[in-house]
């Protein structure tokens, strides 16, 4: 189990998790606000 937690804390795994989270966040923002450039303030 110690080796598995060491593997999960390596840079490629952390980067992949962070990129997946960021991509999902951007997709959901674009789903609820489809074209933010069209907003007129």
UniProtKB/Swiss-Prot annotation:
A Pfam family recorded for this sequence: PSI_PsaJ
GO cellular component, one term: photosystem I
Gene Ontology biological process terms, A to Z: photosynthesis
Keywords linked to the UniProt accession: Chloroplast, Membrane, Photosynthesis, Photosystem I, Plastid, Thylakoid, Transmembrane, Transmembrane helix
Subcellular location: Plastid, Chloroplast thylakoid membrane
Transmembrane annotation, as ranges: 7-27
Main location: plastid
SUPFAM superfamilies documented for this protein: Subunit IX of photosystem I reaction centre, PsaJ
Membrane topology note: Single-pass membrane protein
Family affiliation: Belongs to the PsaJ family.
Function: May help in the organization of the PsaE and PsaF subunits.
HAMAP family: PSI_PsaJ (MF_00522)
PANTHER family per record: PHOTOSYSTEM I REACTION CENTER SUBUNIT IX, PTHR36082
Protein's name in the database: Photosystem I reaction center subunit IX
Source organism per UniProt: Oltmannsiellopsis viridis
Gene transcribed to yield this protein: psaJ
């Amino acid at each position: 189990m110690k080796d598995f937690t060491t593997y999960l804390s390596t840079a490629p795994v952390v980067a992949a998790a962070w990129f997946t989270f960021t991509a999902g966040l951007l997709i959901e923002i674009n789903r609820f606000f489809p074209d933010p450039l069209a907003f007129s303030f």
